[in-house]
Amino acid sequence: MEKEFDDMLQERLTEAKQIEKAKITNFLEEVWKNYRKSKKEDFIQSPQTGYNKKELTRLAKKINYLPEGKKYFRKILKLFDDRLAMLESDKLDWAMGELLAYATLLQDGFSVRISGQDVERGTFSHRHAVVKTEDDEEEVIPLKLISDSQGKFDIYNSFLSEYAVLGFDYGYAFNTPNGLIIWEAQFGDFFNGAQ
């Protein structure tokens, strides 16, 4: 059996040596075909980046709505109520701004993928993109509940293995030109280690 395997390897090596020119196929060509390199002229005028306030308010209510009939932790209910109260005061905090940015991208059909050690909750408990019910730990992800036609939203708490996770997301980003792919360092020296 070992000899058969060695013979097969030798045969393949002999075949490979007979090929004079290797053909390299760009496997990402198809997903990037609608894009081109930027030109100097592209930066003369800034693109429109604003979002309609009425639509932002609708999205804010949507991403801060927790489906009824489930038992949530009081702390989570207060957080979501406080977020809705922010809308009335016309003052948003960083977390709400971040969630709204994701919501607008998703609403416009772009995908968003976030990974990192503590991204579902947010390192300092600011995000709570994933909420777990108190009684059975069912996961509720409001950013997945915006509309039937929204972009795909994925969020993953990863292992404390920066090289592997960042490497995976770097490759994932190459294959997802219409998506926002984020690897989030928790805090401290994790970012430097991954670099």
Regions found by a protein language model. Give the residues of each.
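Flexible, glycine-rich loop/tail regions that form catalytic "lids" or insertion modules at the edges
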Residues: 1-195
